[in-house]
Amino acid sequence: MQTASWVMVMMMVWITAPLSEGGKLNDVIRGLVPDDVTPQLILRSLFFHRPSDSVVRSTVPVHICYWKVCPPSPWRRPNGKG
């Protein structure tokens, strides 16, 4: 919880610091997003997938669990217990 609070404070400072130097909010927000990310690119990536994406998804096992009961597989211990 402390880490989340710290991250929130840092994000607020990161956004508001340029504003105190005379920047406009819209310019600050645009500065947080890479230039090559556009709504068209986002929509295209949602609807059109490369064939390799579906092959990768079909070979990776999907773990559907609650966080406290079954953490994601990369974080599981080698002995298979919790």
Curated annotation (Swiss-Prot):
GO cellular component annotations of the record: extracellular region
Signal sequence region: 1-22
Residues excised as propeptide: 23-57, 75-82
List of residues that carry 4-hydroxyproline: P71, P72, P74
A single GO molecular function term of this UniProt record: toxin activity
Cystine residue pairs: C65-C70
Source species, domain of life: Eukaryota
Annotated function: Moderately activates human somatostatin receptors (SSTR) with a preferential activation of SSTR1 and SSTR4. In vivo, does not cause behavioral changes in mice within a few minutes of intracranial injection, but causes a progressive loss of movement thereafter. Four to five hours after injection, mice recover, even with the highest dose tested. Shows antinociception and antihyperalgesia activities in two mouse models of acute pain, most probably by acting outside the central nervous system.
Domain notes: The cysteine framework is C-C.
Note: This peptide is an evolutionarily optimized stable analog of somatostatin. In addition, it adopts nearly identical conformations as in the somatostatin drug analog Octreotide. As this drug, it contains a D-Trp at the same position, whose synthesis is a common strategy used for enhancing the metabolic stability of compounds in drug design. Consomatins evolved by gene duplication of a 'Somatostatin and related peptides (SSRP)' gene expressed in the snail neuroendocrine system.
Protein name in the entry: Consomatin Mao1
Naturally occurring in which organism (per UniProt): Conus maioensis (Sea snail)
